[in-house]
Amino acid sequence: MNPILKKLRLVSGKSVLILNSPDDFLQLVKNEGIDVHEEVEDYYSYVQIFAENREEAEELLNDAMNAIETDGVLWFCYPKSGTDLNEKTVFNLLSEYDLSGVAKVPLNDKWIAIHISYSDDAEDGGFETEKGGKFRGDYDE
């Protein structure tokens, strides 16, 4: 398996949701035999979003939070430069949802991925998902 996909915990045999992905990354995932959905059709144990700017990030993050299973894996990807998104603005946006980044993986020369978990500082202990229950993330490293 591709080492980047391994770091992202993308494994074959599961349906995953990847929103707004660049074509080259999407093809890389599909070449590994992973069942990729590009539109929200169900609930998923793995959701990854690619946002080029804050406005797009807010929309995609809302979509992701409505599609993620309670103990799902959630990744937020943004460009390394040339946009209004950077590490500080991404972490500020995540904090609005009581989410936090727990790991960072460079995908290539353009994109950075942040593994998201529910913030331990949150009063209610998790983000209410559309499926019911609280998203906490599964980070265990």
Question: What kind of region is each of these model predictions?
Answer:
Residues E58-L94:
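Mid-chain, well-packed structural core segment of small domains
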Residues D120-E141:
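Flexible, glycine-/basic-rich loop-and-beta segments that form/coincide
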Residues V47-A57:
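Short, glycine-rich nucleotide/cofactor-binding loops
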Residues I34-Y44:
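Short acidic low-complexity segments
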Residues M1-Q27, N31:
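N-terminal, charge-rich interaction modules
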Residues E52, P79-S81, L107, S119:
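Beta-hairpin (beta-strand-turn-beta-strand) motif
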Residues F91-L93, Y97-D121:
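Long, charge-dense
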